[in-house]
Amino acid sequence: MGSFEDRKATGTVFNIQKYSVHDGPGIRTIVFLKGCPLSCKWCSNPESQASHPQVAYNKGRCIGCHRCIKACEHDAITVNEDGTLSLDRGKCDVCKTLDCAHACPAQGMIIYGENKTVDQILKEVEKDALFYARSGGGMTLSGGEPLMHADIALPLLREARHRRIKTAIETCGCIPWDTLKEAAPYLNYVLFDVKQMDSEKHREGVGVGNELILSNLKKLLTEFPNLHVQVRTPIIPGFNDNDEFAYALGEFLKGYENVGYEALPYHRLGTQKYDFLSREYAMGDVSLPDGVAQRIQRIVDETRGAVTEEKK
């Protein structure tokens, strides 16, 4: 067994997703840790952004029993004229018990986020050990930004390695270098998001500049040349769906052999969760024209001199 301290470390998990084949090699279990330093306008997991557990209201499941109102000690829930409910998010966000959700018999009120120990998380992950062994898969830490919570992410990676579970991480890169450096020896694979090369445009889209992100990526590629890094970009309409971005990223990645690249087309999955959290989806009804992500992929690959499967 690993250290007692590592096994008992705790953090807030909002989902454990099994049988994933898109977030690292093989069949994987993804552990989603809550909390992120970025505020991406297109985020498909808005419940991942705040670090604390949150209550969400799904009016489609509400049966109008009002047990949630009776259970709430903060008078945070009111009934609208159409029978739906409104939540005072200022009161909900400081609530420690979320009694409204526990009282709901229909899952109209649900909780995003649950405190779990490393032992509890890995007990769930290990259930699919046979699939990992046969496919070369393992556990992927995601978020949010998993390394924002080093007090749970690092013990989880160490203990997974101790239990011979292959590990990967999805990161936005906006974390202290020392944290990423400490995590790297316990990782088999890194999925590293680069959303924009221009810092001001980056700030407009996600709330912070990109200097730390690009610095961390360069250090990771340089100091850990045997660690495979897959850079990924969600291609967002009006944000990074242009050739200028693609050429700049290709130049940045030129010369590194331990890095792959994937351009991911924009999608609208997860927009309903904004309603559940009483938030507006900032992207509206925009869509990405067919072929744009493929064009970005081609430009990045050609600029950095990568050999794609099509060229072979």
From Swiss-Prot:
Domain 4Fe-4S ferredoxin-type: 53-82, 83-115
List of residues binding S-adenosyl-L-methionine: 42-44, 144, 193-195, 267
Protein name, per record: Isethionate sulfite-lyase activating enzyme
Gene name linked to the record: islB
Annotated source species: Bilophila wadsworthia (strain 3_1_6)
Classification lineage: Bacteria, Pseudomonadati, Thermodesulfobacteriota, Desulfovibrionia, Desulfovibrionales
Binding site for [4Fe-4S] cluster 2: 62, 65, 68, 104
Names of required cofactors: [4Fe-4S] cluster
Cofactor, how bound (note): Binds 3 [4Fe-4S] clusters. One cluster is coordinated with 3 cysteines and an exchangeable S-adenosyl-L-methionine.
Listed transmembrane segments: none
Highest taxon in the source lineage: Bacteria
Keywords: 4Fe-4S, Iron, Iron-sulfur, Metal-binding, Oxidoreductase, Repeat, S-adenosyl-L-methionine
Binding site for [4Fe-4S] cluster 1: 36, 40, 43
Record field: catalytic activity: glycyl-[protein] + reduced [flavodoxin] + S-adenosyl-L-methionine = glycin-2-yl radical-[protein] + semiquinone [flavodoxin] + 5'-deoxyadenosine + L-methionine + H(+)
UniProt cross-references to Pfam families, sorted A to Z: Fer4_12, Radical_SAM
Enzyme superclass (EC): oxidoreductase
Molecular function in Gene Ontology: 4 iron, 4 sulfur cluster binding; metal ion binding; oxidoreductase activity
